[in-house]
Amino acid sequence: MTNKHNEKENALSGFIAAAGTILTISYPVLALSTGTRASVRLLRGDTTYLPDGLSALAATFYIIATIGLIYRNPKGWYLSVSVLFLETICTLIVGGLSFVYPDVIGNTAWRHFGADYGYFPLVQPLLGLAWFFHPQTLAIYNVNPRWLAYFRK
């Protein structure tokens, strides 16, 4: 019984380590691509501002999440978790609205839940939240939210 538990724990630890590496690489790349695209389109001025403004907001979220991934302290943890929750909410809202009002939403990073970016804008914050709430990550960031104890019972 203990060996199976240890095997599962080791497999999960490997997954969590891999997820952290993926996030550390993918967030800056997505910030660069989304931010560059939004900046070029906004500076050109031949576009509607809402879609590109939303893409710029997404790029800002990605940059903030990257900062939280780099600074492994409680402030970095709370910063990243907050922005990942916001990013998830924005992806779901804008992604849903892009099917109902495609002309208004336009071509944002969150359109159709991030279809233009391989659905990374939808999957990435969920993976990030799973990573940030894993016990190993909480220990790395030296975070022990009291409210989290209610979910561990």
Predicted regions and their residues:
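Topology signature of small-to-medium multi-pass alpha-helical membrane proteins
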Residues: 2-153
